[in-house]
């Protein structure tokens, strides 16, 4: 893509925004290299990466800003030059970030990001050794080696001994009088005393320095000299040990230089994807549909650099028409519309989300050519018109079928009549090449050309006749008018002057104005008819909704009737069973009292009575099926006795709303909720006992130390849900102190839980700021 084209549609400004969104140095460098692509499959893949980046942003905790410019470090490693402690520590942080990023992305549903992180390199043992051996500023820790720790211990003890040897001069009054000041100074790593020059013989030792006036000599007493010499020896040994440690770590890192460099670059790629996602959030942008059919279909498109000031527009190019001519007055928003078309097309091809509806379709064009703005050149002695002509010449020579051409103020800068004629000829040439064109102009002749020519359409930016200002709204199919006479009339210019001006207009211009007026009239009539149809559709939908409500009410009534009949005949069935038992008991009694010969008669009598009961209490419906709840029905949770509303029903489970919580339960965990006061009274003691048991058995403390935020979230969620159902009023969650990441996650999460009343750090004797007490409603 021509760099000049990218600059004219302000694409570098978008790249600058993307650069700012990247955290790391490699990510920022990659952002500067983002350019439009031509392969639809690659573009689609880049857009899907941004989609994953948006999802990943919700979980991301790893800070990539530690990845600064490592080029000097990599150069030193390639030459096996010894690294400094700070450089080693920075490489350790790179490997740590690599490990954290790997595990963070591996736990989520990010297939494309996973393809990147599976190539990351990290050595956990090496990272631990580096963090054990170096402070962030690069100082080597005592724990780096036992030998270093021993030497530093000796150095510390020796320094104490030297200080004690010198301090005795401050403590003894006879010696203190020889000093200018009662303090100890350091000169060249040696402890010295500020001795008056006249008393130098009274403090035997080595003179290391003198004051500017010569009145003070800085003397190291002989009692401290031997210890000072020993200190120098120990410090040299310390330096040798540190150099050995630095060399060892340099060698370990150099062995993995190729993998480390690759990891650095891959983390930059991940950072770029996340930066694109951040930019999409800032611009309120969405993923466009990419196609190869050469159609541009913008829905609610906005210029990405105008923020809330941008007026959205709809535009489709390549279906009903291939050339669009936008007419209207200057400063009406024509150029902004043209730039919006260009920059959104390029952004989509660069794998960026665009500020437009997700229904927007971006067709791939071979090239995008642009002639926007004033390129008047003093050096080349070119006028505005000449510079436009040179651009147009280049476009006409290079544009091919399937390209997109954006032309601003076509036909201006010269005689209006000749300019319009030239503009028509240019458009005809491009139309013949089957090039897609969007051109802006305030030349009215081009509006007539659009009306008369096949696959050419007019558009205009709306003008408010009351405020006499443009609204920047785009209207497809409606040619624009200059509105000069209308504005003059609205501002109160004399009517005779307006009429005189009209008389100067040529007959062709008046005809053109009438043609535009007639088209506008037809457009208004069509819009009115469209509005009537829309209102009719709304009315039909309202009636349909009303009928659906009535059908739903009828269905509920039907179910209520069936329920009542079932209850009634269930009672009858119980009555049959009761009376049947009485008959059997009666028969048994008679069997005992009657003789054997009467047994047949008694059995026949029993059969007859059973038959009578069956006929009298025949059920008019099918046997009761196993309980299956309906959406909207109130049920009772078997385990806790709490009522809930059914939201959805599956094959053998239901989703219910219990208070402020949504639960997924099987049919055997719920039963119909019936308002039976007696049963409720009987159940009070039982329910209270159940709640008491659940409270007694519930663990009031949860430990999430050692987890990351992804692991901790479902554990905390389930724990709090169970605590709430059990009626627990207060729990304690132990998160530790550490980096503070778990505490931050927990407190952010608790703020969003509706049944959490409040939360705070635990008392000092119960964990302090390493634990959080949570109070439930």
Curated annotation (Swiss-Prot):
Residues 702-777 form the Smr domain. Keywords: ATP-binding, DNA-binding, Endonuclease, Hydrolase, Nuclease, Nucleotide-binding, RNA-binding, rRNA-binding. It holds the Pfam family MutS_V. Signal peptide: none annotated. It is an enzyme of class 3 (hydrolase). Belongs to the DNA mismatch repair MutS family. MutS2 subfamily. Endonuclease that is involved in the suppression of homologous recombination and thus may have a key role in the control of bacterial genetic diversity. This is Endonuclease MutS2. It comes from Carboxydothermus hydrogenoformans (strain ATCC BAA-161 / DSM 6008 / Z-2901). The gene is mutS2.
